[in-house]
Structure formats: C-alpha cells, structure tokens
Amino acid sequence: MSSRGGKKKSTKTSRSAKAGVIFPVGRMLRYIKKGHPKYRIGVGAPVYMAAVLEYLTAEILELAGNAARDNKKGRVTPRHILLAVANDEELNQLLKGVTIASGGVLPNIHPELLAKKRGSKGKLEAIITPPPAKKAKSPSQKKPVAKKTGGKKGARKSKKQGEVSKAASADSTTEGAPTDGFTVLSTKSLFLGQKLQVVQADIASIDSDAVVHPTNADFYIGGEVGSTLEKKGGKEFVEAVLELRKKNGPLEVAGAAVSAGHGLPAKFVIHCNSPVWGADKCEELLEKTVKNCLALADDRKLKSIAFPSIGSGRNGFPKQTAAQLILKAISSYFVSTMSSSIKTVYFVLFDSESIGIYVQEMAKLDAN
C-alpha cells in the first residue's frame, strides 16, 4: 500500500527474467512472428531460442578467450573468434558460410613452400643419416602367396587383411602409414588440418617418420619405451644412442635430441627428458618437452610423429594430468606455428586405462 492508500505500483517482470535467460525473449518472439505470420508460435519457442543463442555465445567467447591466451594477447579480437569457430568441429560446421568482420582468413599453407624461420628449441645431433631404405623386390619376381590363397579360406584371409589396412589408413594424411599390427581407436582433426590419432600398438612397430623416447639426462634406454625400441632396433640402435650421448652431453629437463632410427620402421627417434611429477614447474616443463619434440620434427620436415604417454611411467605423472598437458601443448603448438610440416600425431598406447583417458580427453579438446 502507498501512503495515500492506493495500490503499490508493481514493476513488470520481463519474459527473459521469468525464463532465467539474459537474451531478450520478447524481442525474439516479435522477430519470429514477423517472419512467420501464418504459423502459431508457442510460448516456449522464443525462450528456447534465447537459451540456445546464449549458450552458443558463451561457448564461442570461451574458445575465443582460449585462442587469445594461446597467442599471448590480453584482448579478444575478431581474429580470435574466427580461430575459435574454426577450431571447433561443430561450430565450424554450423557457421561455415558466416563471414566474421575483421577476422581475416584461414590460409591453406603448404609447409614445403615456406622457409623455416624459427630456431630449434632442443639440442640437435650434428649430422644424422636415416637408415637405408629397404630394397624393393623386382617386378619380375613371382609371389607364391597369390597361388596359396586360393579357395574360400584364402579369399576370407585377404579380405580381412584388406579391412585392417583400410581401418589403419582411413584417417591418416601421411605418406607412410603405420603397420598392420595396430588399431586406430580415435581420430581428431585440428583446424589447420593436422590429425591426432589414438593407436593401440607396439611403439617400436609404428611406421611413422619419428617416434618419441622418454628418457633421462643420460639417455637411459631401460624404461618401457626404451626397452621396446632396443629390442626392435638391436645393436645399431644402442650404438646410435651412445653416439648421441657422447656428442650431445647430458640432456637438460624438457630438452630433446634426435638420432637415426636404426633397425626401426621409424626414420628417427626423438629422445626427450621429461620432468618428474611434483618438481618445480613440472606441468609447464612437460608442455615444453612436447613442444620441443614437435619443433625437432618440424626442423627435419617430418610429416608424422608417434608419442607414448610421456611422464606417466617412472616420472609419476597421473595419467589424466599427463594426457591433458600433452594434448594442450600439441594444440597450442599448432595454433602458434602456422608453417608446420607435421600432418599426423599418433598417441601409441597399450593399456586400457591410458587409451580410455586419451580418447576422453581428445573428445573434449576443443572445449578446453
């Protein structure tokens, strides 16, 4: 009641306030009615529309903020909004025909045509010659296998092998796809075309341009990955590592060095000294380790690189934390390096826990 006895004037509550959204529900209802005069518009239609637009706006702003942070900028610009949309598969599909003013363009860069201006972030071996390529069989030689696979069993076997090889190379953009003894469990495409693939296999059998070997300052090869590579590469691989240790000296934390992949399907092995969990700035150093490995691969113009789960073995990183940091480092590297020669990054895993974590973290990579 007012002082004169009349009713107190009540303030009108807007439709947006009633629905609990910020975007103007009443205005959207007018726009919908204006464009569709023949149809009956439900009360919930503008509310749902406002909620969806509000969610999309918040999502784009969050991703644009991440892009600005990765580019070390303190203000979000239209360029960052364009990068945010392009880096999210669903948003990119939704806003494919939309032009963002002052956002620039996403060039289709061929790394082979660009001069390398950025210096290496890790220590390099002076001169490394990759192992000689295997001699191809002459076309005159007859293949007895073709004769032996006659009948239903042979046809069934060749069909099964064909399916395996198709599944292996379906999403790969590299010239040398991995061998048949593996399974691609998940694939993620980044906005500049690079592909991330979770692979269940033995890392020593992966036919990529480079494989990553987590080690220590003394190039120790007694860990899980090192032992596997030593078993496959044999004496030549061990001698190459010893020679690298002699030339390079102790490997600093987060540092990386490369040697030839003697006895391995991979041309090169990138040795990296990852930090120990609990050490000072260990998370930052793990990201730096991954970026240094990628930088070495770029310096050699390699197209594919295979990572194990760095840091989650003897160095004690929780598997999920290690996966998050590694994926974040890779995504950040490709955002800041527009001229990368790397087309495919493999995550070579063997245990179900690591596989599940990487598949899960890769699925929400854009949101992070």
From Swiss-Prot:
The modification Phosphothreonine is found at T129. GO terms for cellular component: Barr body; chromatin; condensed chromosome; nuclear chromosome; nucleolus; nucleoplasm; nucleosome; nucleus. Residues 2-117 form the Histone H2A domain. There is a cross-link at K116, K117 (Glycyl lysine isopeptide (Lys-Gly) (interchain with G-Cter in ubiquitin)). SMART domains: A1pp, H2A. The modification Phosphoserine is found at S169, S172. Residues 128-179 are annotated as: Disordered. GO terms for molecular function: ADP-D-ribose binding; ADP-D-ribose modification-dependent protein binding; chromatin binding; chromatin DNA binding; double-stranded methylated DNA binding; enzyme binding; nucleosomal DNA binding; promoter-specific chromatin binding. The modification N6-acetyllysine is found at K116, K123. The modification N6-lactoyllysine is found at K7, K9. The keyword Acetylation applies. The modification N6,N6-dimethyllysine is found at K123. Variant histone H2A which replaces conventional H2A in a subset of nucleosomes where it represses transcription. Nucleosomes wrap and compact DNA into chromatin, limiting DNA accessibility to the cellular machineries which require DNA as a template. Histones thereby play a central role in transcription regulation, DNA repair, DNA replication and chromosomal stability. DNA accessibility is regulated via a complex set of post-translational modifications of histones, also called histone code, and nucleosome remodeling. Involved in stable X chromosome inactivation. This is Core histone macro-H2A.1. The lineage of its organism: Eukaryota, Metazoa, Chordata, Craniata, Vertebrata.
